């Protein structure tokens, strides 16, 4: 079994606690994968800071291609946060546009989701902005 947790890019306390619990599981040998908290991970600097936050291993990125149906489901799921979306997406492009833009950037022109595996005993190569390869 694999455990999925937020990378805690947006510094929300609940995400930070989930990240800490996931790291503890990884230290016990449980495979752990972290997802990028959208929309906070859209900021390359915030993402690099989250990845630089101490962890007992290295980060290995992997991209998962998204079909148009999966991208649409992601937008629908984000739209369910009715109390948060008016605050989060009040400036700039709307939520749908930001989701698509981010997915295309992550997938280098094709919609994708980026996940981060925590690999105990490995060091993370130097990360750089803005692409966060």
What are these regions (language model features)?
Residues 1-2:
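Structural motif
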């Amino acid at each position: 079994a694999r455990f999925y947790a937020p990378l805690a890019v947006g510094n929300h306390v609940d995400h930070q606690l989930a990240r800490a619990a996931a790291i503890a599981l990884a230290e016990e040998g449980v495979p752990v994968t972290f997802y990028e908290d959208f929309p906070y991970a859209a900021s390359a600097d915030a993402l690099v800071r989250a990845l630089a936050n101490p962890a007992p291993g290295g980060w290995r990125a992997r991209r998962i291609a998204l079909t148009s149906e999966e991208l649409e489901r992601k937008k629908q799921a984000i739209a369910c946060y009715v109390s948060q979306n008016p605050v989060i997406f009040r400036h700039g492009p709307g939520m749908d546009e930001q989701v698509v833009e981010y997915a295309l950037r992550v997938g280098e022109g094709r919609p994708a989701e980026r996940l981060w595996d925590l690999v105990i005993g490995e060091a993370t190569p130097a990360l750089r902005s803005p692409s966060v390869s």
